[in-house]
């Protein structure tokens, strides 16, 4: 395995995939943000699934994921899109949260020049949503800057319609590597929408990545726990932390022996 930097760096965040929820987008019990390189993660998969392979990692020379300003991605390193919808480092940092938009009726910005860095819909009120996010869980807004925007997708959801939404800036002077929590940030946006618009048709019900009997948002998260938290009118921010913190602590210990850098 020829290793390469993880542009999102070392932070860990999110729920661990539960048994029975394995899919094309979730092969094993790891959190949304695992904080490993491909080489390190491959070694974990070899051990976890007891694969009988001769596995060797060609290590990165001089990679220092804990050093700014680039952290996981050295500033001088050229960005080459791994996908048409992965246009830059800001997207890579936000993606652990914005990927969940694929399981919703909200546009994730496909059909714009900045997909997976923003979200919205024609009927949203972004300033109200940001105010509710600030009221409900202000700590989850750290390490980035949110900006209300309008955009018009040229394809995909809401093609040709003017959408109102929110752009996530996890870059420049706004970016805090340790404090930015994209998975909680996007979860918070869902929660704010549910609190402001209780009957909003948020979850997209369609076949997703070869899964026909499960909601896409649950497939992406490896369980229904996140969706259930969003839809529970009595659930507070601390309730999601109560679900997630043990998974994050366990992964922090579990991955320790696989770190090469």
Predicted regions and their residues:
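Glycine-rich, charge-decorated loop segments at or immediately adjacent to ligand/cofactor-binding or catalytic sites
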Residues: 1-21
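Sec-exported extracytoplasmic/periplasmic mature domains
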Residues: 10, 46-50, 194, 198, ...
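Conserved anion/nucleotide-ligand pocket segment
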Residues: 21-98
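Glycine-rich, aromatic-lined ligand/substrate-binding cores of catalytic
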Residues: 63-158
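Flexible, low-complexity junctional segments that flank or bridge functional domains
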Residues: 245, 249-259
């Amino acid at each position: 395995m020829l290793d390469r930097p993880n542009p999102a760096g070392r932070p860990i965040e999110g729920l661990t995939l539960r048994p029975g929820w394995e899919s094309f987008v979730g092969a094993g019990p790891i959190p949304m943000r695992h904080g490993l390189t491909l080489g390190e993660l491959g070694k974990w998969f070899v051990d976890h699934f007891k694969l009988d392979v001769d596995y060797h990692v060609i290590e990165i020379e001089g990679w220092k994921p804990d050093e700014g300003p680039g952290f996981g991605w050295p500033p001088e390193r050229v960005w080459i899109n791994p996908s048409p919808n992965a246009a830059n480092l800001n997207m890579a940092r936000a993606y652990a949260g914005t990927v969940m938009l694929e399981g919703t009726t909200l546009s994730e910005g496909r059909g714009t020049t900045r997909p997976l860095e923003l979200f919205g819909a024609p009927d949203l009120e972004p300033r109200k949503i940001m105010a509710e996010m600030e009221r409900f869980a202000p700590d989850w807004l750290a390490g980035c800057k949110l900006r209300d925007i309008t955009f018009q997708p040229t394809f995909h959801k809401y093609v040709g319609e003017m959408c109102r939404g929110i752009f996530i800036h996890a870059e420049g002077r706004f970016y805090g590597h340790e404090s930015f929590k994209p998975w909680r940030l996007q979860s918070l946006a869902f929660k704010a929408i549910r609190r402001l618009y209780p009957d909003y048709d948020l979850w997209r019900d369609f076949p997703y990545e070869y899964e026909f009997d499960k909601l896409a948002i649950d497939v992406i998260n490896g369980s229904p726990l996140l969706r259930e938290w969003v839809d529970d009118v009595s659930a507070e921010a601390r309730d999601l932390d109560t679900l997630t913190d043990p998974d994050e602590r366990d992964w922090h210990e579990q991955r320790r022996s696989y770190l090469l850098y």
